[in-house]
Amino acid sequence: ETEVMPVYEMYKVGDDPYWLDGINLLESATGIRAAVIAHYNNAQGGTHDTRFCFAGERRMKMLEELLPGDTAILGIDEHTGISFNLDEKSAEVFGKGVITFKKGNQMKTYENKSVLSFDEFLEF
């Protein structure tokens, strides 16, 4: 299963970072193994770091270390989306922000109207 971040438990309850088992929809449809994180660029925290869906940088680094080595992070900024065309095996980014694909020490961002093949993700 692809991992899911328990946002409420970490942000509101104060639990230490951990992953839950997800339903693996992205990988089963596209072959792309990634934990999807919405609100990747959140800035509503004022003096608190709420990037990475309210996890903040410190907890996000801890979460990354807990991911299996073959799992990437697909970060989706606020007011941004990504559409997957299963027939053409491609994805298109839309909206005001970017999507971030990160695996290990490698990271790449894609902005509005970027079109990528599934292979670009798989070769990452």
Predicted regions and their residues:
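Class I SAM-dependent methyltransferase SAM-binding "motif I" and its flanking Rossmann-like core
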Residues: 1-49
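Glycine-rich, charged/polar anion/phosphate-binding loops
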Residues: 18-22, 59-60, 78
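Solvent-exposed alpha-helices and their adjacent loops that cap or buttress functional pockets
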Residues: 25-29, 65-67, 74-75
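A structural signal for short, well-ordered beta-strand segments and their strand-loop junctions
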Residues: 35, 73-76
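Glycine-rich phosphate- or other oxyanion-binding loops that anchor nucleotides, phosphorylated ligands
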Residues: 53
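A short, acidic, amphipathic alpha-helical segment used as a generic capping/interface helix at domain edges
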Residues: 58-70
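Short beta-strand scaffold segments in enzyme catalytic cores
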Residues: 80-84
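A conserved C-terminal secondary-structure "cap"
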Residues: 85-124
